[in-house]
Amino acid sequence: MKTSEERLLAPDSLPPDLAPAPVPQGSPAEKNTDFEPVPPPCGGDDQPQLATDPVASLVVSQELQQGDSVPLEVEFNTSSELSPGIEEQDVSEHASLPGEETNLPELESGEATEGVSEERAEVDEGDTFWTYSFSQVPRYLSGSWSEFSTRSENFLKGCKWAPDGSCILTNSADNVLRIYNLPPELYSEQEQVDYAEMVPVLRMVEGDTIYDYCWYSLMSSTQPDTSYVASSSRENPIHIWDAFTGELRASFRAYNHLDELTAAHSLCFSPDGSQLFCGFNRTVRVFSTSRPGRDCEVRATFAKKQGQSGIISCIAFSPSQPLYACGSYGRTIGLYAWDDGSPLALLGGHQGGITHLCFHPDGNLFFSGARKDAELLCWDLRQPGHLLWSLSREVTTNQRIYFDLDPSGQFLVSGNTSGVVSVWDISGALSDDSKLEPVVTFLPQKDCTNGVSLHPTLPLLATASGQRVFPEPTNSGDEGELELELPLLSLCHAHPECQLQLWWCGGGPDPSSPVDDQDEKGQRRTEAVGMS
C-alpha cells in the first residue's frame, strides 16, 4: 500500500515533460505538475487470498414471461429520511454497511446553522485533473491472462472499477470474483518500459454460477468498513464479501411462497448505501444493509396482467432523481420511485432481454442494452415515451455485453461479440435524425469483449474478454464406420482469448513506439479497425 506522499505518474509512453493533462484551474504559467494521488489498494496483503462459500441451499426455477409494454404515469414522493448504513461483523447476519458521512458539525434540536457552509471547498488552482481523450487509439498498459487459462472453458464475464478507483473487480465462468490493485508501475517516479502481468490480491469463490455482482456504493479504500462487494449466485443467498480480506461478512436471503431459497438475478446498492435492491422474477426485493437476513420489502413489478414481467436482470439508480430503472428479460424497462417502488413508466423497444442499464451523470438521460440486439438505446426521463437516438453495436449471443460512460458523460464505450471496442462522443447527440458514429474503434483481442469499465478519476479503460465456446460438429465419415469410434463434437476451431486488460486513454500525443505483437508475457499490439 502506497503512502499519500507518492504521486501517480503517466504511463511510460508519456514522459513527465510530455505528460498530457487537462487545462488546470490556473493559468498556464501557474500550472503545477503534481498529479492526483491514487487511492490506496483494497487488498491488505500482497499474496492472493482465497475465500470459499459454505452456503448451499435449495433452488427455485423461474420461468421467463413477457408482458405488455404500457406507459404508466404515477407521481412519487422523495424519500424523506435515509436509513443508516453495514458495520463490519462476522457472518452472523447482523452486519451493516456505514452510511455516508458528512463534515458538518452535529447540532442540537432547534440549534441554528449559522456559519455552517455546505458548499464544496474550492479546488486548488495548482491541481491537475486527468480527463479522457480518444483522439487516438488507447495504449495498452497491462493485463491478466494466466489467471484465467487454467481451465479451457473459463472466460471473463465483466469487470468493474471500485467507486474510489483503487482496484478493479472481475467475474469469470469459474465462479470466482477477483480483485486487482492498480499496477504498481503507476506509482513509480521512473519511466516504465514494461508493465508486469497483473495478479489478483483476493479471490472470492462462489458455490455456483454468479448471476451478478457489485461494489458497495460508498466504498472507499481509506475506510475498510466500507470496502464490500455483493454477489449473487445460483442456489445461494446474496453474499457480502470483505474487499480487504476476502472473508464472507453477511448474507441476505430471499424465499418464495414455498419458503424455498431463491437466488437474485441482479444487484444494486442505493446511492446512500442504506439499501440493497435485488431483482427476481417479476419482483424486486429491498434489503436494509443494516439488517442482514431474510427480512426485506417485496415490490412486485407485475400484477393483474399489468406491469413489467420477466426476470429483473439489471437495476440502476438515477444520480439526480429519486428513482431507479429495472431492465427485464421480458424486453422492457421500468421506472420506479425509490421510496415506495410505485411505477412511473414502462418502456419497450429492444429486440431481446435487457442486460445492462446506465444513467448519464446529469440524471436526465439513461442508456439500455440487450442480448441479441444490435442497438444501444438512449432515453430521456423528461420524455420517457420517446426514444432519443440509438447506437449500433454487434451483439449476436445471449451474453451480457457491458457498456460504460466516463465521469463527465461525454464518451460512451462498449464492446461487442467480435471483440471490437467502440467509443462514441455523445456530448452533441441531441437529435434522432442523424446516426451517431464512433470516434474510435479498436480490437483488444480476437474474442468477445464483454466488459468495459472507465476509471472514475484517471484515464484508464479496463476491458474483459471471453465467451462460452460451443463444440462444432465434425464430419460423420463413411456410413459403414461404427458410431462409437467417431468424435461427435470438436473444439478444434475454438481459440478463446480470456484476458483482463488496462488501456491508457489520456489526452495529447503518444510519443512512445508501438507495442509489438503479443509476447510471452501476454502484451498485445492494439489493432485499430477504424477511426473517424
From Swiss-Prot:
Per the record, the major location class is: nucleus
- PTM comment, free text: Phosphorylated at Ser-61 by ATM in response to DNA damage, promoting its interaction with histone H2AX and localization to sites of DNA double-strand breaks.
Residues of the region (Disordered) are 1-53, 80-122, 510-532
Q: Where are the WD repeats?
A: 151-190, 206-251, 256-297, 307-348, 349-389, 395-434
Q: Name one Pfam family in it.
A: WD40
What biological-process terms (Gene Ontology) are attached?
Cajal body organization; DNA repair; positive regulation of DNA repair; positive regulation of double-strand break repair; positive regulation of double-strand break repair via homologous recombination; positive regulation of double-strand break repair via nonhomologous end joining; positive regulation of establishment of protein localization to telomere; positive regulation of telomere maintenance via telomerase
Keywords on record: Chaperone, Chromosome, DNA damage, DNA repair, Nucleus, Phosphoprotein, Repeat, RNA-binding, Telomere, WD repeat
List where in the cell it is found. Answer: Nucleus, Cajal body; Chromosome, Telomere; Chromosome
Gene Ontology MF terms: histone binding; identical protein binding; protein carrier chaperone; protein-containing complex binding; protein-folding chaperone binding; RNA binding; RNA folding chaperone; telomerase RNA binding
Which domain of life does this protein belong to?
Eukaryota
* Basic and acidic residues: compositionally biased ranges: 520-532
State the PROSITE patterns in the record: WD_REPEATS_REGION
InterPro entries, per the entry: SWT21/TCAB1_mRNA_Telomere, WD40/YVTN_repeat-like_dom_sf, WD40_repeat_dom_sf, WD40_rpt
Task: Tell me a GO cellular component.
Answer: site of double-strand break
Reply yes or no: does the keyword RNA-binding apply: yes
PTM sites of type Phosphoserine: 27, 61, 83, 476
Provide the family line: Belongs to the TCAB1 family.
Q: Which PANTHER family is this protein grouped with? A: TELOMERASE CAJAL BODY PROTEIN 1
Q: Oligomeric state and partners?
A: Component of the telomerase holoenzyme complex composed of one molecule of TERT, one molecule of WRAP53/TCAB1, two molecules of H/ACA ribonucleoprotein complex subunits DKC1, NOP10, NHP2 and GAR1, and a telomerase RNA template component (TERC). The telomerase holoenzyme complex is associated with TEP1, SMG6/EST1A and POT1. Interacts with the chaperonin-containing T-complex (TRiC) complex; which mediates the folding of WRAP53/TCAB1. Interacts with COIL. Interacts with SMN1. Interacts with RNF8. Interacts with histone H2AX.
Record protein name field: Telomerase Cajal body protein 1
Q: Which gene encodes it?
A: Wrap53
